[in-house]
Amino acid sequence: MKGVRMKLVYIASPLRGEILSEKDYSKNIKKATEYCEKACSLGVLAFAPHLYFTQFYNDTIPEQREKGLEMGLSMLEKCEELWVMGKNISQGMRGEIAHAKNLGIPIYHVEMPDDIMYYPVSADNHALLGQHSCMPDSRDKDYMGKI
């Protein structure tokens, strides 16, 4: 589709835990891929830094890991939202969350990322209702006739 602008969303999910095994690493890469696929199916452009930067930086080499984290934070600055996937927040994710807060980037915590219904986009591909969607004087006790 020509001329359609998609919202750029940064996907934060664990790459490695406290103890990294090859099995956990592969599982986390697979999950990040699934999260991006689901997010893209909702009409956003999803970016997970650990899917991209691990193609040429080795996360087990400290200097290369730091370079990948630095580049990820630089990419986060260009994103419109940060989606934090799951309940397990890694050290890298904590840095991403702190950076997004400092920049004023909206952060959405998707506690159950395996179920697309919990993603912060409605079924009709529009953003979920936010403060701007509320009715004027919505603190009134009587809403009759105002909708």
Predicted features and spans:
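Conserved catalytic or regulatory cores that recognize and/or transform ribose-phosphate-containing ligands
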Residues: M1-I147
